[in-house]
């Protein structure tokens, strides 16, 4: 029995999970090595260091399955160097990377969340698809690009070593964060260094802060796993509870389960800050900003009271990819709802084949649509905006919003967190399919009624016609 196996027995954690955690924690000493010995070396030397370390981490976690990222690196090189700027390159990227991932899901799909080579490969999939799209943008005329595309467009094709380093960078190859090649190049070129060309010491405190926050979330998640195990929702003890308490326990379990993602992102971000990748320029006062690869905005995630706050605070890297590389490129559809549906379907497919993934994103779509319709009603109804803007109203609005998104997301996450239909169908039935009923039956009907019965601001008087103005003059 190896060291990891012994630790697995002592901690009751799976060996695969321990290997992943050790690899993520290794990002801190590796960051120290980079900022001590490699930060001012030529790009090729840094790339070689990243490739060697990244392959080692993959082998430590996945063994011979390291062949999968290697094949994808060669695929990315071929597409970006021999198909750059063509529509075919976008199709090829999805066939080569997303297709590769989906085949992996097909052969490794089980009833639980298993950590296999597909776990880190899903990160590489989006990174390389984004790379191909950025190279595609770089081949277009600048005047045809949107502002966000100009920031990430790559006009000079990356070489094989740079692509390998980009995909295998030790602080992003296993659990994220997502970042673009332009961001990676800025880091390798030393744009994050201080005026003396040295790694800024201002990275230390933010790095430690994110690490400690990640550890806190990890402890809370582990405590939650023992307190509310997944099996509880198919037990007699759960089914004998009242409807309110069944839904409340689901909501609490959802929050505690999400903390494992929060923990890994925060710990990884801390290491990214220490290495310099997290540098994001300077603020208005000239201080270094270290939120360049932020995946979790803690305060907004914990205190936000609408669905916008969730999207803006949680899994920011993937959400940014979806916004810039999928949603905004669907402008030709000329329909915001259709673009939203396509984007969420894309993310569901990226997660895998389980029905629950698609239902989760479906409920999310219903929630966001209901929120947008409610906001539109508030804006058009006289006195409503004024009433909720009063200080005395704010606490009640926050409580209502926080409970609404927490309970709605808790219901939806049942179908994601319990994975297999045979595990989540019982708990969903016990909640009487409440999320689907509210957002796809009750609210649409109520919205149509409110549109007809609520008063609205009077339309502004039409501007006088030029001819009429002349007559009056």
UniProtKB/Swiss-Prot annotation:
<dbReference type="GO" id="GO:0006646">
    <property type="term" value="P:phosphatidylethanolamine biosynthetic process"/>
</dbReference>
<comment type="similarity">
    <text>Belongs to the membrane-bound acyltransferase family.</text>
</comment>
<dbReference type="GO" id="GO:0005783">
    <property type="term" value="C:endoplasmic reticulum"/>
</dbReference>
<protein>
    <recommendedName>
        <fullName>Lysophospholipid acyltransferase 5</fullName>
        <ecNumber>2.3.1.-</ecNumber>
        <ecNumber>2.3.1.23</ecNumber>
        <ecNumber>2.3.1.n7</ecNumber>
        <ecNumber>2.3.1.n6</ecNumber>
    </recommendedName>
</protein>
<feature type="transmembrane region" description="Helical">
    <location>
        <begin position="431"/>
        <end position="451"/>
    </location>
</feature>
<comment type="function">
    <text>Probable acyltransferase which may mediate the conversion of lysophosphatidylcholine (1-acyl-sn-glycero-3-phosphocholine or LPC) into phosphatidylcholine (1,2-diacyl-sn-glycero-3-phosphocholine or PC) (LPCAT activity).</text>
</comment>
<keyword id="KW-0256">Endoplasmic reticulum</keyword>
<keyword id="KW-0444">Lipid biosynthesis</keyword>
<keyword id="KW-0012">Acyltransferase</keyword>
<dbReference type="GO" id="GO:0047184">
    <property type="term" value="F:1-acylglycerophosphocholine O-acyltransferase activity"/>
</dbReference>
<keyword id="KW-0808">Transferase</keyword>
<dbReference type="GO" id="GO:0030258">
    <property type="term" value="P:lipid modification"/>
</dbReference>
<feature type="transmembrane region" description="Helical">
    <location>
        <begin position="66"/>
        <end position="86"/>
    </location>
</feature>
<keyword id="KW-0594">Phospholipid biosynthesis</keyword>
<dbReference type="GO" id="GO:0040032">
    <property type="term" value="P:post-embryonic body morphogenesis"/>
</dbReference>
<feature type="transmembrane region" description="Helical">
    <location>
        <begin position="341"/>
        <end position="361"/>
    </location>
</feature>
<dbReference type="GO" id="GO:0002119">
    <property type="term" value="P:nematode larval development"/>
</dbReference>
<dbReference type="GO" id="GO:0106262">
    <property type="term" value="F:1-acylglycerophosphoethanolamine O-acyltransferase activity"/>
</dbReference>
<keyword id="KW-0443">Lipid metabolism</keyword>
<keyword id="KW-1208">Phospholipid metabolism</keyword>
<feature type="active site">
    <location>
        <position position="315"/>
    </location>
</feature>
<dbReference type="GO" id="GO:0016020">
    <property type="term" value="C:membrane"/>
</dbReference>
<keyword id="KW-0812">Transmembrane</keyword>
<feature type="transmembrane region" description="Helical">
    <location>
        <begin position="20"/>
        <end position="40"/>
    </location>
</feature>
<feature type="transmembrane region" description="Helical">
    <location>
        <begin position="396"/>
        <end position="416"/>
    </location>
</feature>
<dbReference type="InterPro" id="IPR049941">
    <property type="entry name" value="LPLAT_7/PORCN-like"/>
</dbReference>
<dbReference type="GO" id="GO:0006659">
    <property type="term" value="P:phosphatidylserine biosynthetic process"/>
</dbReference>
<feature type="active site">
    <location>
        <position position="351"/>
    </location>
</feature>
<dbReference type="GO" id="GO:0005789">
    <property type="term" value="C:endoplasmic reticulum membrane"/>
</dbReference>
<comment type="pathway">
    <text>Lipid metabolism; phospholipid metabolism.</text>
</comment>
<dbReference type="GO" id="GO:0006656">
    <property type="term" value="P:phosphatidylcholine biosynthetic process"/>
</dbReference>
<dbReference type="InterPro" id="IPR004299">
    <property type="entry name" value="MBOAT_fam"/>
</dbReference>
<dbReference type="GO" id="GO:0036152">
    <property type="term" value="P:phosphatidylethanolamine acyl-chain remodeling"/>
</dbReference>
<keyword id="KW-1133">Transmembrane helix</keyword>
<dbReference type="GO" id="GO:0008374">
    <property type="term" value="F:O-acyltransferase activity"/>
</dbReference>
<feature type="short sequence motif" description="Di-lysine motif">
    <location>
        <begin position="470"/>
        <end position="473"/>
    </location>
</feature>
<feature type="transmembrane region" description="Helical">
    <location>
        <begin position="43"/>
        <end position="63"/>
    </location>
</feature>
<dbReference type="GO" id="GO:0106263">
    <property type="term" value="F:1-acylglycerophosphoserine O-acyltransferase activity"/>
</dbReference>
<keyword id="KW-0472">Membrane</keyword>
<dbReference type="GO" id="GO:0040010">
    <property type="term" value="P:positive regulation of growth rate"/>
</dbReference>
<feature type="transmembrane region" description="Helical">
    <location>
        <begin position="88"/>
        <end position="108"/>
    </location>
</feature>
<dbReference type="GO" id="GO:0071617">
    <property type="term" value="F:lysophospholipid acyltransferase activity"/>
</dbReference>
């Amino acid at each position: 029995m190896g060291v990891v196996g012994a630790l697995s027995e002592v901690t009751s954690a799976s060996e695969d999970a321990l290997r992943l955690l050790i690899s993520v924690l290794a990002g801190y000493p590796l960051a120290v090595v980079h900022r001590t010995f490699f930060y001012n070396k030529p790009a090729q030397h840094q790339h070689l260091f990243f490739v060697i370390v990244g392959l080692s981490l993959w082998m430590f976690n996945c063994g011979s399955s390291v062949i999968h990222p290697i094949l994808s690196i060669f695929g990315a090189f071929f597409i970006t160097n021999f198909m750059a700027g063509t529509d075919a390159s976008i199709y090829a990227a999805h066939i080569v990377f997303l297709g590769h991932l989906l085949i992996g899901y097909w052969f490794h799909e089980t009833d639980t969340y298993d950590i296999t080579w597909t776990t880190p490969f899903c990160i590489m999939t989006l990174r390389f698809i984004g790379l191909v799209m950025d190279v595609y943008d770089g081949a277009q005329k600048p005047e045809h690009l949107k502002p966000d595309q100009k920031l990430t467009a790559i006009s000079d094709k990356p070489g094989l070593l740079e692509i390998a380093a980009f995909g295998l960078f030790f602080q992003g190859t296993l659990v994220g964060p997502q970042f673009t090649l332009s961001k990676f190049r800025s880091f390798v070129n030393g744009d994050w260094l201080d005026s003396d060309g040295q790694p800024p010491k201002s990275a230390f405190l933010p790095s430690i802060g994110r690490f400690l926050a990640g550890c806190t979330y990890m402890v809370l998640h582990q405590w939650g796993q023992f307190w509310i195990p997944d099996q509880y929702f198919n037990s007699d003890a759960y089914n004998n509870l009242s409807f309110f308490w069944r839904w409340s326990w689901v909501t609490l379990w959802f929050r505690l389960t999400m903390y494992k993602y929060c923990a890994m992102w925060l710990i990884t971000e801390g290491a990214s800050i220490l290495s310099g990748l997290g540098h994001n320029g300077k603020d208005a006062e000239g201080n270094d900003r270290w939120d360049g690869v932020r995946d979790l905005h803690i305060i907004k995630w914990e205190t936000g009271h609408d669905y916008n706050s969730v999207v803006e605070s949680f899994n920011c890297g993937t959400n940014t990819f979806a916004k810039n590389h999928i949603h905004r490129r669907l402008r030709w559809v000329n329909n915001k709802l259709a673009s939203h549906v396509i984007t969420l379907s894309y993310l569901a497919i990226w997660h895998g084949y389980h029905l629950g993934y698609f239902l989760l994103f479906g409920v999310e779509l219903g929630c966001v649509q209901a929120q947008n319709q409610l906001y539109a009603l508030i804006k058009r109804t006289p006195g409503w905006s004024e009433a909720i803007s009063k200080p005395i109203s704010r606490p009640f609005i926050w409580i209502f919003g926080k409970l609404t998104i927490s309970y709605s997301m808790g219901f939806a996450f049942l179908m994601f967190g319990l994975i297999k239909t045979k595990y989540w169908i019982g708990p969903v039935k016990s909640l009487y399919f409440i999320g689907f009923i509210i957002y796809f039956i009750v609210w649409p009907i109520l919205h149509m009624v409110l549109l007809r019965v609520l008063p609205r601001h009077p339309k502004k008087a039409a501007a006088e016609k030029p001819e009429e103005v002349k007559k009056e003059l």
